[in-house]
A protein has these predicted regions:
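Nucleotide-sugar-dependent glycosyltransferase catalytic domains
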Residues: 1-204, 208, 213, 222-224, ...
Length: 327
C-alpha cells in the first residue's frame, strides 16, 4: 500500500503498535543477516541486540512514555536513513470493550473485587490468545492455593477446532482443575473466563498482574501503576518481558524462556514461591512502576512528550497535503 500511495503522490505513514526496542530489533535484522546469518534457534541467548542496550546511567529510571522509550528511540534514529518517528503513545483503550454477553461476567468480577482489601489480589490474565493445557492449569491452581493469597484468574483453553482460532472459556472447571480446588479456595479466589482487563487493572484491590506481556497489556498495567510478573507465551512477548525485567526494571520474572519451543511446565512450587514473593515483599519494582504511571500520564497531557509528538505528526501531515486545483 505504501508503494501505491507513493505512485499516486499521497503521503503515507506506518502505524507501528509495538515498542521502540522491538522496532529497533527488526531494523537490526538485515545487519545481523549480513554479519551472522538468519539462525536464532541455536544462538547464545545472551547475544547483544543493539536496541536492547540501555544507554542511561546505572540506577536512572528510564523516561518511558509508553511508546516513547527515550534511549531506544535514539538508537532507532541514529545513523539510519528512515523517515521521522513520531512517538504518539499511549495507544490504549482505557474504557475497554465489553460485549453484551460479557456484562454479567464483568459485574460479578467487579463486585468480587469490591469486597477485597486494597492491593491484596494477584490477577492472572494472558490476553485474547493466551491459553494453557490441562496439566499447566492444575499446577497453577495448586501453586495459587498453597500461596494462601487472594487471586483472580482468567482461565482459557486452547481451541480444539483450529490452531489459529481463539481460546475458549472452560465449560466445566471441575474437570480441568485439581479435585476440591474450587471449594477450598472459594473464600480467597475467583476464576473466570473472559475478564475486563482494563477495569480490573484499575481496581484498587489488584496488587500484581501475572501477564503474557503483550504490549497492550504492559501499557495498561503501567498506566494504572500495577507491577507485572512476566509469563510470555508467543510472538514478541519474550523480548517484551526481557525489556521490562532486565532492561527497564519495571517487572519481575515469573517465567522467561529464551529458547524457542520450550513446553516445560511451570510447577506448583515455583508458582507458590513466586506469588508469595510478589505479595509479601516490599518491592522496589512497585515503586518504580508507580513513578512510571505518573510519567506516562504526564506524557499525554499538553506539554508532555507524546502530546508534542502528536502535534509534530499533524503538522507533517498538513504540510504534505496537496489540495487539487479547481477546474
Amino acid at each position: 500500500m505504501i508503494d501505491v500511495a507513493h505512485e499516486l503522490g499521497v503521503p503515507s505513514y506506518v502505524f507501528f503498535t509495538g515498542n521502540a526496542a522491538f522496532f529497533g530489533f527488526m531494523l537490526y535484522l538485515p545487519t545481523r543477516h549480513d554479519q551472522v546469518g538468519i539462525e536464532f534457534r541455536e544462538t547464545d541467548p545472551e547475544s547483544a541486540i543493539p536496541s536492547y542496550v540501555n544507554p542511561l546511567p546505572p540506577g536512572a529510571l528510564p523516561s518511558l512514555a509508553l511508546n516513547k522509550e527515550g534511549g531506544y528511540i535514539s538508537f532507532v534514529n541514529h545513523g539510519r536513513k528512515i523517515p521521522p518517528i513520531y512517538t504518539v503513545g499511549r495507544m490504549i483503550d482505557l474504557k475497554g470493550k465489553t460485549h453484551s454477553g460479557d456484562n454479567q461476567a464483568k459485574q460479578e468480577i467487579m463486585k468480587w473485587l469490591d469486597d477485597q482489601p486494597p492491593s491484596s489480589v494477584v490477577f492472572l490474565c494472558f490476553g485474547s490468545r493466551g491459553s494453557f493445557v490441562e496439566p499447566q492449569l492444575k499446577e497453577t491452581a495448586l501453586g495459587l492455593e498453597r500461596s494462601g493469597h487472594r487471586f483472580l484468574w482468567s482461565v482459557r483453553l486452547p481451541s480444539r477446532d483450529d490452531g489459529l482460532a481463539k481460546p475458549t472459556d472452560a465449560e466445566n472447571l471441575e474437570e480441568i482443575l485439581p479435585p476440591g480446588f474450587l471449594e477450598r479456595t472459594r473464600g480467597i479466589g475467583m476464576i473466570c473466563g473472559w475478564a475486563p482487563q482494563v477495569e480490573v487493572l484499575a481496581h484498587k484491590a489488584i496488587g500484581w498482574f501475572v501477564s503474557h506481556c503483550g504490549w497492550n497489556s504492559i501499557l495498561e498495567s503501567l498506566w494504572h501503576g500495577v507491577p507485572i510478573a512476566t509469563w510470555p507465551l508467543y510472538a514478541e512477548q519474550q523480548t517484551n518481558a526481557f525489556q521490562m525485567v532486565r532492561d527497564l526494571g519495571l517487572a519481575v520474572e515469573l517465567k522467561i524462556n529464551y529458547r524457542l519451543g520450550s513446553g516445560a511446565l511451570v510447577i506448583a512450587e515455583e508458582i507458590e514461591k513466586a506469588v508469595k514473593c510478589l505479595m509479601e515483599g516490599d518491592s522496589e519494582v512497585r515503586k518504580r512502576v508507580k513513578e512510571m504511571s505518573e510519567k506516562s500520564r504526564e506524557a499525554v497531557i499538553e506539554g508532555g512528550s507524546s502530546y508534542a509528538s502528536l502535534g509534530r505528526l499533524i503538522e507533517a501531515m498538513m504540510a504534505n497535503v496537496t489540495v487539487p486545483a479547481r477546474k
